[in-house]
Design a protein with these regions (language model features):
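Short, hydrophobic alpha-helix immediately C-terminal to the catalytic nucleophile
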Residues: 10-14, 166
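Conserved alpha/beta-hydrolase "acid-adjacent" motif
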Residues: 127-133
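Catalytic histidine-centered segment of alpha/beta-hydrolase-like enzymes
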Residues: 149-163
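Flexible "cap/lid" loop of the alpha/beta hydrolase fold
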Residues: 14-52
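Conserved alpha/beta-hydrolase catalytic His-Asp/Glu region
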Residues: 34-35, 55-112
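Short beta-strand/loop motif that positions the catalytic acidic residue
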Residues: 114, 120-122
Length: 180
């Protein structure tokens, strides 16, 4: 699971209801361990940031430069026109719900006992943004292998370089199969 999908995967692993032999958490978001009021302020920041990017092409392109975040062979203008139109379809309520649920989901105090091989990936360019998540995952799932991906930002590997993502995933899955 990548980003918010990583939050879903983290919860699935913690509950241990579905057997999972190996898991890749790619830049997964972990729940804030902060007071309610602080989490509400962070939610306001996230909603404001999203709305600014959705309503300003300049801000969107400053946050996600087209030359970096457009898949090879695709037209950046068409891609960003489509993204801009898509981002404007989100209601305020949806934006709030997405950010609140991704950052504040409930986990048991201790995860279920699972034998899952877990790796947590993050882009080296997002390392500072993921410090809290990495620390949480290391503590919560001590068996996790942490792996920085060189010269990548958040979700860049899977979105812009899917073939490279597949090579990393295949390497992890093959390595795990050999450890049995």
């Amino acid at each position: 699971g990548c980003s918010m999908g990583g939050a879903c995967l983290t919860r699935m692993l913690a509950l241990g209801k579905i057997p999972i032999s190996r898991a890749i958490i790619d830049g997964g978001i972990t729940p804030y361990q902060l007071p309610f009021l602080v989490r509400k302020l962070l939610l306001a920041r996230d909603v404001l940031s999203f709305k600014m990017a959705a309503n300003s092409r300049k801000i969107l392109e400053a946050a996600f430069p087209p030359e970096r975040f457009t898949t090879a062979g695709h037209d950046p203008k068409k891609e960003y026109d489509a993204m801009e139109a898509y981002l404007k379809t989100f209601s305020d309520r949806t934006i709030r719900n997405v950010f609140w649920s991704a950052n504040n989901y409930a986990l048991p105090k201790r995860p279920a006992k699972i034998g899952t091989k877990i790796t947590y990936w993050y882009g080296d360019d997002e390392k500072n943004d993921r410090k809290r998540d990495i620390r949480f995952i290391r503590h919560y799932f001590p068996q996790t292998r942490i792996h920085g991906i060189p010269k990548m930002a958040h979700a860049e590997l899977v979105m812009v370089h899917p073939e490279k993502f597949c090579r990393y995933a295949e390497k992890f899955l093959t390595m795990q199969a050999e450890e049995r």
